[in-house]
Amino acid sequence: MKDFYEKYYARVDSSKAHATFCEKVFGMNLCQHGFADLHQLGLLIETTGIKATEKVIDIGSGNGRIAEYLSDRTGAHFTGLDFIPEAVMKARQLPGAKNGRLAFIEGDINALDLPRNGYDVVLSIDSIYFSSDYPTTISKLDETLRPGGRMGFLYSHGREPWVPKDQFPKETLPPDSTPLAQALTANGLAYTAMDLTDRDYELAKIRKRVLTELEGQFAEEDIMFVYENRLGEASGILNAIEEGLHRRYLYSVGRPG
């Protein structure tokens, strides 16, 4: 997994094919490797109520483009954490990092060492999956929140293509039963969940169509590994949703003041 992301972040910044893909699918090229379009990012801002005076940490920030966009939208100071050195290096070259509005650090979601009461808002945009122990990770994220702090998670849960249909636990699909919901509950955290599955389905269809249109460009740039990864994601999500075995949610913890 780490090898893939090292290769991914070394190539996509300069890829015209991937930039076009992100623009057509997500509404803007933020070098997305995930499932969040501008609409979902807007909902994340709205539900967490990020203010210009606040400090936010983005867990799994990649090369920082999404953190930069969210900081531009809200005026807040963002710290991005990622475990890929190449991604962090590129993030530190962003204009916001140079003027002090953005900071980026290397870190592992399974070995978090964050300051207690260090942030007003914690964001996880399709990154909690990398945790090997959701309850422990949530506990550490909760500890880094200041009084009145909030957390926002864009999160998908469903059958992966390699899991037989009859072996996937359907009972974990409702919003109060997903692994993330169980981890939040185990930590005594109240939350709300917004169902984004219909949006996820439409975006998966768009991804497949756009990738088909751009296949030649990905091949010319010799980054078919990115094309194949994105196509596999889209196909897997479409199949799982059509089987009734996939959900996408926005989980919000705490209330903006």
Role assignments for model-derived ranges:
Residues 1-25:
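N-terminal, positively charged/glycine-rich alpha-helical extensions of SAM-dependent methyltransferases
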Residues 34-52:
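Conserved alpha-helix/loop element of class I SAM-dependent methyltransferases that forms part
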Residues 57-59, 63-111:
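Class I SAM-dependent methyltransferase SAM/SAH-binding core
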Residues 113-122:
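A short acidic, Gly/Pro-enriched loop at the edge of an enzyme's catalytic core
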Residues 121-133:
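A short SAM/SAH-binding and catalytic strip from SAM-dependent methyltransferases
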Residues 135-150:
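A short glycine-rich, Lys/Arg-flanked "PGG" loop and its adjoining helix->strand segment in the class I
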Residues 152-172:
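Short, glycine-/aromatic-enriched active-site segment of Class I SAM-dependent methyltransferases
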Residues 195-257:
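Conserved Class I S-adenosyl-L-methionine
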